[in-house]
Each structure stands twice: as structure tokens, then as C-alpha cells.
Amino acid sequence: MYIRGLKILLWVFITLAVILSAVWLLSFGKIYDKQNLEYGITFSSRQAKNLGLDPKVLFVKILDELKVDKLRLVAYWDEIEPENNNYNWNDLDWQINEAGERDAKIILAIGGRLPRWPECHYPTWTNNLKQEQKNSETLEYIKITIERYKNNKNIIAWQIENEPFLSHFGECPELNKKFLDKEIALARSLDSRPIVVTDSGELSLWVLAARRADIFGTTMYRDTYSKVLQRYIHYPITPAFFQVKKNVVNLFAHPKEWIVIELQAEPWGPKQYQDLSQAERDRTMNLEKLKEMLDFARLAGFQEFYLWGVEYWYWEKVSNNNDGMWEEAKGLFAN
């Protein structure tokens, strides 16, 4: 019995050693020099309005003051088609034209699930449609949007849906993978530019999203608030977590590019951040945390990052006389 017990312990030790060695090896990957990193932002006119800002004024400042030349823009379906077959392209046309005049590169996000709360942005007229009809209308909106903009040379990729495999987050229907595949296939049939599929960095496994992507985009957050736990959370992970995850997923999926599509650069609290005190906002984002986040992201082994929070930086600047993050961003995008 004694010898048998020793053999079991030895096998346990060997197994653990192999697992730990594999994790250690998978945690290695290329880390890019700071001068080779590329930064962009996600812009939401909806979020700017929510903060009481003029979206057009802000957008021009993003282009001309911050010198941002990589953008993720959002084709909100409920704004583009507020009534069935009644389209309003004015806002998105303007954004794309302004970006084009500065030769900025654009990822255009399309779908029912898109950036910013409540995550899904279906027009109200689709609420009472049967699912089959709603799907048909969704495909029609994607088709019309891509056909409208596919001759624009500044659009470099189409993002189809936003974090589709995180359907439990936000006010959204359950994911239908087969329909997601139809959306992606439609986009591919209309234009040859790459397809971006995104997923949560901390809450998803990536494989299903990465398999569908030419460009896979992860989110990256460190400090958030959980309504379920009713407390603030600091994710106890290191940059190596993303290196390991990427290397493991790369065994099963082979996107051509891996990017950080949503890098936390704004607070995440129990309420909208404009309704939080400065001290409360600082718990999850401020200038020092932004600098830490940028260092963390670089060490995670990615080269391209789209920051999430440009509306917040400007709101802090004009509403609270706090221009620290805005000025930090100037230096970031100027490099």
C-alpha cells in the first residue's frame, strides 16, 4: 500500500509538473516595442449625446486635436432605420466623410448587437416581428449598409455584431449561432474586406468567435462593477493570462490578426459614470489607471488597440475641468 501510494503521488506530481510547464510555455509570446504599437478609438455619437456633448464637435476634436487615425464607428440600426424602409444616413455619412477627409481608417460595426448599453439596438418596429422576419430584416439592413459604404476606401473591415457570444450581457436575445453565420456569410458575399468578430477578454473562451474571424478582437478590462455581486471587481490576472489564452485558442482557430477592440479607458460603476462622484469614478478609471492599463495591454502581446472611453475623457475635460486623460491621449496618438 505504501509503495502504491508513492506511485500515485509521483504521477500526480508529474501531471502537475507537465500542466504547469505547458502553461508556462504558453505564456510566452511577442511583446511589441512601444514605438510599434498602434492605437485607435471607438466613437459613439449616442454616448456623446448621453453625456450632453455635441457629437460633431467632439468627433472633429478627436480627429484634429487627438490626431486619431484609426476608428471603430457604429452603424446603429435603430438610428439608421427608425421606421421600416425609412432610412436616415446623415449622422453616419458625416462621420465617415469627416474621417475620410483625414484619411483615417475605419472598422464599421454592423448588426443588432453593437457597442454601448443596452448592447442591442434593434429598431422598435422589429419588436413584434416573428423571429424569421426579424432575421430577414436584420440581413437586409446589413446588406444595405455594406452596399452603401463598400466603395469607401477608408473602411478597412466590417465588424459583424459585438461580442455575440456574450449574449447574457445586456438586454439582448439569446445568440443563434446559425444566424450569426448567415450574417457573416452575407458580409463576405458583398465585399472582400476582412470580417471582425469580437469577444470578451475575461468572460469568454474566444474559440467560437476566433474561428469565424479574419480579425479577432478581444475586450480588455481590469476594474469593473458587478451588479450580481454588488461590488467592485479587480480582475486578478496578469498580461500572461491573455498570452496563454491566445496561444491555446490559436491551436483551434486561425484568424489573420488579433487585436484589442475594446481597451478599458473609462469608469465602470453601479450607475452611469456621469452620475458617480469623482471618487467613485476614480475607483475604476483615472489618469494613473489609464497609464497602467496601457502598460498592461502592451505586455499582453497585442500590437493594435482601440480605446474605449474617448467620450469620457472629453466629458471630464469640459464638465469637470479635468483634462488629464485627454492630454495623455494626445501624446499617445501623436507617437
Set out the residue ranges of the language-model regions:
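Surface-exposed, active-site-proximal loop segments in enzymatic domains
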Residues: 76-91, 114-135, 164-172, 230, ...
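Active-site groove signature of glycoside hydrolases
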Residues: 113-115, 138-173, 306
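Boundary/entry segment of secreted carbohydrate-active catalytic domains
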Residues: 22-69, 74
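Short, acidic/polar
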Residues: 49-65, 138-148, 199-209, 286-296
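Substrate-binding cleft of secreted/luminal carbohydrate-active enzymes
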Residues: 156, 257-335
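Glycoside hydrolase catalytic-domain groove-lining segments
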Residues: 189-273, 324-328
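N-terminal Sec-pathway targeting helices
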Residues: 1-20
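Aromatic-lined substrate-binding rim segments of carbohydrate-active enzymes
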Residues: 57-126, 170-197, 211
